[in-house]
From Swiss-Prot:
Originating organism: Haemophilus influenzae (strain ATCC 51907 / DSM 11121 / KW20 / Rd)
Keyword Ribonucleoprotein listed: no
EC number of the protein: 1.6.99.-
GO cellular component: cytosol
Domain of life the protein comes from: Bacteria
Origin organism lineage: Bacteria, Pseudomonadati, Pseudomonadota, Gammaproteobacteria, Pasteurellales
Gene Ontology molecular function terms on file: NAD(P)H dehydrogenase (quinone) activity
Protein name (record): Uncharacterized NAD(P)H oxidoreductase HI_1544
UniProt KW keywords: Oxidoreductase
Family: Belongs to the NAD(P)H dehydrogenase (quinone) family.
Length: 202
């Protein structure tokens, strides 16, 4: 079984998000799962979708670096995104990754005038760090907006259903004990996903 972890944070070594991603990688390896770890900043991923690339994608011509990401996604049974929420959206490098990688003909197609998602039979989870208070976000409905637009809205469009996500808030205010509890929650949720997927493959 294959697990694709996509991590986006400029502090690739010491960020809280990296600690979450590392723990998820560890729990996956402990389950005998093959892990593809994509650290977008460490890769120096180019997030700019050029006009030429957009036109080529519509004609089925894909750059080599994007084809590699396509291969990782196609092989993945579980896809995990770990990133900070900045200005109510993805970090620019992750947004650019999705712009370039979720291309027409790969992530979706047009059939009888309608878009059809092509990334079926895949599980996804997202762990999102925020500097603000999660309860305040929920009070204003931000969590629902994120779910409708960036999470299930975006990935349902590509054929991935029931995307689960967890917001980890107040990350600059909480102590190490609280951070460790959040990391272990991410590990527990990942373990539950892996257990269910491994059982399906028996």
């Amino acid at each position: 079984m294959n697990h694709l972890i996509i991590f986006a944070h400029p502090n690739s070594v010491r960020s809280f998000g990296r600690a979450i991603a590392n723990r998820i990688e560890q729990i996956s390896q402990e389950n005998g799962v093959n892990v593809f770890f994509r650290d977008l900043y460490e890769m120096n991923f180019n997030p700019i979708l050029s006009h030429e690339e957009l036109q080529n994608a519509n004609n089925g011509i894909i750059p080599e670096d994007i084809q590699q990401e396509h291969d990782f996604i196609l092989q993945a049974d579980l896809i995990t995104l770990v990133y900070p929420l900045w200005w109510m959206g993805f970090p620019a490098i992750l947004k650019g990754y999705l712009d370039r990688v979720l291309s027409h003909g790969f992530a979706y197609k047009t059939e009888n005038g309608e878009s059809v998602g092509l990334l079926k039979n895949k599980q996804m989870q997202q762990f999102i760090t925020i500097g603000s208070n999660v309860d305040k976000y929920k009070e204003f409905g931000v969590d629902k907006s994120l779910n409708h637009c960036l999470i299930n809205g975006l990935f349902n469009y590509c054929g991935i259903e029931n995307v689960e996500f967890e917001l980890f808030g107040d990350i600059h205010l909480i102590d190490d004990k609280a951070r460790k509890a959040m990391i272990e929650l991410a590990a527990q949720k990942t373990q539950a996903k892996l257990t269910a997927l491994l059982k399906e493959k028996e």
